[in-house]
Regions:
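Short, well-structured N-terminal submotif of metal-dependent ribonuclease cores
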Residues: 1-37
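Small, basic N-terminal interaction modules of short regulatory proteins
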Residues: 2-3, 80, 154
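Alpha-helix capping/helix-boundary segments
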Residues: 10, 41, 114-115
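Short, flexible loop segments at the rims of nucleotide/cofactor-binding pockets, characterized by
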Residues: 12-13, 58, 83-90
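Residues that scaffold the ATP/ADP-binding catalytic core of kinase and kinase-like folds
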Residues: 13-14, 48, 57, 118-119, ...
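Short amphipathic alpha-helical segments and helix-helix/interface helices
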Residues: 24-25, 69, 97-98
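PIN-domain endoribonuclease scaffold, especially VapC-family toxins
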Residues: 27-84
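Acidic, PIN/NYN-like endoribonuclease modules and their adjacent C-terminal/linker elements
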Residues: 88-91, 95-98, 102-109, 113-160
C-alpha cells in the first residue's frame, strides 16, 4: 500500500509519541506500506522543524532536527513532483500531497480540514484521504501490528 503522509502526520510519526502513528510505523518498517514523498515535502518538514515550538519539543526529547530528517530519509521514498491533480485544495501548500496521492493511487494521511474536504472528490479518481491509519486498515480488513516507538526510529537513523 502506498501512503502519502502530510507534515503534521510526519511529525506524529517521526517525533511525537502519537499512538495513532504506531501502526503506520510498523507498516513502513515491515514493508506493508511505502511512504511516497517528494523533495519539496522533505524541505517543508525541515522548515517546520526550525519553528521555535518544535525546537523545544526536539530539545525535550534530546533529539536534533537532523535525526528526524534522517528518519524521514530512511522511511520515505523520494519521487519526482507529481503533475497537478484535477482536484484542488484551498491551501496551495497542501496541493503537492494531493497531487502525489492521486498520481500513485495512494492513501493520503492528514489531519488538515482542507485536505480532508477533498476526500469525496479524490475517491472516484483512486486516491484515499484518511485522518487515521485505522480507518484505512478497517476498510481493508487489516489489523495493526506492534512496532517500535519514534525514539527507536530516530536512534536507528542516527549516524554512527
Amino acid at each position: 500500500m502506498n501512503l502519502v503522509i502530510d507534515t503534521n502526520w510526519a511529525l506524529d510519526l517521526l517525533l511525537f509519541d502519537e499512538p495513532a502513528a504506531a501502526s503506520v510505523r510498523a507498516a513502513l518498517q515491515t514493508g506493508q506500506a511505502r511512504w511516497l514523498a517528494t523533495q519539496s515535502m522533505r524541505s517543508e518538514l525541515a522548515r517546520v522543524l526550525t519553528y521555535a515550538a518544535l525546537q523545544k519539543q526536539l530539545a525535550a526529547r534530546h533529539c536534533a532536527a537532523e535525526q528526524v530528517l534522517a528518519a524521514f530519509d530512511n522511511l520515505a521514498r523520494l519521487l519526482p513532483a507529481a503533475p497537478r491533480a484535477p482536484v484542488l485544495c484551498s491551501d496551495a501548500d497542501d496541493q503537492p500531497f494531493i497531487d502525489l496521492a492521486l498520481a500513485h493511487q495512494a492513501t493520503l494521511l492528514t489531519k488538515d480540514r482542507r485536505v480532508l474536504a477533498t476526500a469525496r472528490r479524490l475517491a472516484p479518481l483512486g486516491a484515499r484521504v484518511a485522518q487515521r491509519w485505522n480507518a484505512v486498515n478497517e476498510a481493508r480488513g487489516q489489523t495493526a501490528n506492534k512496532c517500535c516507538r519514534p525514539q527507536q526510529i530516530l536512534k536507528a537513523a542516527a549516524p554512527d
